[in-house]
Amino acid sequence: MNTSLKPGTTLYVGTAIDTIWSQIYYHVWWPGQGNDPMYLMNQSMNRTRNNYYENNYTPHMYTNGKDSGSGTATWISDPKTYLEEVGLYEINLIGTRSGNEISFDVKMNAIETTPTSQDLRLFVATVIDTVHYPASPNGLTEHHNPVIALLTGNTGKQMKFISGITYTESFTWSMPSGWINHADISWKSSGLKAVAWIQNYKSKEILQVNEFGFN
């Protein structure tokens, strides 16, 4: 999946998508020995999200909540189907970083008021752009965009939007000590970023997403 962001590779999605999409990764406890540190450092979150998507194999990609499977053809084609869609929601993030601590605001608004029957949820993830794991049992020593934590909870925060109203959520977060002191992985705090998205919890469709880098 990582090669989809590398120009010149056969899996590259193209500049039209490269500049606008957000990729995040949840880690799993199988098929290997269950010793992936990016899974072990937040088992509850990784299990909750994998179970939500009913994921039972890896690698396994979802695009805006749609199952894109494990085939490289759909990894390339599925994101392109959303290029002409117009979103009804807007998300903007702004913040600062001091060492391993970040503070930021997520601002949201909607064109339409949320129907009472619709279950929309806000997810806000802290993510690191690159993690080096030289001792990886499966030989994949460089990992991109693993989710560290979900700041609105593993099942998100329910939101009801009123058209024309701006909603703000504020966060201050520090890198967990397990990540800072882990002997088997390395990363740079300049690679920290926050990713926020609004998701229809029933259909799994992601209605809007944005991210902010703290480098």
What does each of the following model-derived ranges do?
Residues M1-V28:
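Local sequence-structure signature of Cys/Sec-based thiol-disulfide redox active-site neighborhoods
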Residues S22-N215:
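Short, conserved sequence motifs used for protein processing/export or organelle targeting and
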